[in-house]
């Protein structure tokens, strides 16, 4: 059984990994406009893409994914699967609410995939497949994430991973909360599509 102290340490490690704002760092290095002042105001890869810099968007996506994966793997190797779950939650919350940016972070899609990759990679592949299918047919990044994240806990439960299903259900609720403005724009027909510049 995981001790409370180890759980807190694993969570803290995850939070520190997750709070690294790759989108902000990379766009500042590249000299582009402040991400928080364009498009959705999000610091993630989709908003970086709206700057027209596809390479930066790809690098942001990879960075935001791998910080979640790294947090899970480090905690898992040091203290086991229960610690990996604590680190996954920490990494996701770190991305959503980074202390370095006054707790105003991204929406969590890439980090969601990253923690899934570290916890149970087939579910990460399933998430990506659903995301790509919806994105290809609708060109809405937000809708793709909402549908893929809704399906993920159900898939994990069906595959016999109730602990992971519960964790991902919590992450999904947080992801939907961070997408609440996107949901309103989707309902009104004003949501920006993938590839549209700010």
Curated annotation (Swiss-Prot):
The record's GO CC annotations read: plasma membrane
Q: In which pathway does it act?
A: Lipid metabolism; phospholipid metabolism
**GO molecular function term, any single one:** acyl-phosphate glycerol-3-phosphate acyltransferase activity
Task: Provide the alphabetized UniProt keywords.
Answer: Cell inner membrane, Cell membrane, Lipid biosynthesis, Lipid metabolism, Membrane, Phospholipid biosynthesis, Phospholipid metabolism, Transferase, Transmembrane, Transmembrane helix
Catalyzed chemical reaction(s): an acyl phosphate + sn-glycerol 3-phosphate = a 1-acyl-sn-glycero-3-phosphate + phosphate
What's its job?
Catalyzes the transfer of an acyl group from acyl-phosphate (acyl-PO(4)) to glycerol-3-phosphate (G3P) to form lysophosphatidic acid (LPA). This enzyme utilizes acyl-phosphate as fatty acyl donor, but not acyl-CoA or acyl-ACP.
What HAMAP family does UniProt report for this protein, alphabetically?
PlsY (MF_01043)
Q: How is this protein named in the record?
A: Glycerol-3-phosphate acyltransferase
Q: Which organism is it from?
A: Nitrobacter hamburgensis (strain DSM 10229 / NCIMB 13809 / X14)
Encoding gene per record = plsY
């Amino acid at each position: 059984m995981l001790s409370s102290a180890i759980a807190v340490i694993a969570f803290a490690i995850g939070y520190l990994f997750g709070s690294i704002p790759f989108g902000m760092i990379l766009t500042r290095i590249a000299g582009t406009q402040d991400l928080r002042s364009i498009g959705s105001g999000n610091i993630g890869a989709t908003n970086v893409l709206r700057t027209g810099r596809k390479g930066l968007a790809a690098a942001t996506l990879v960075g935001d994914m791998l910080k979640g994966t790294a947090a899970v793997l480090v905690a898992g190797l040091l203290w086991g699967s229960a610690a990996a779950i604590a680190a996954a939650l920490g990494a996701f919350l770190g991305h959503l609410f980074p202390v370095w940016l006054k707790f105003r972070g991204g929406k969590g899609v890439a980090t969601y995939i990253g923690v899934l990759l570290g916890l149970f990679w087939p579910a990460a592949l399933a998430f990506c497949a659903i995301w790509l299918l919806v994105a290809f047919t609708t060109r809405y990044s937000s809708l793709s994430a909402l549908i893929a994240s809704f399906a993920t806990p159900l898939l994990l439960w069906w595959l016999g991973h109730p602990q992971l299903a519960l964790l991902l259900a919590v992450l999904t609720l947080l992801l939907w909360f961070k997408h609440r403005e996107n949901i309103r724009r989707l309902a009104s027909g004003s949501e920006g599509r993938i590839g549209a510049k700010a």
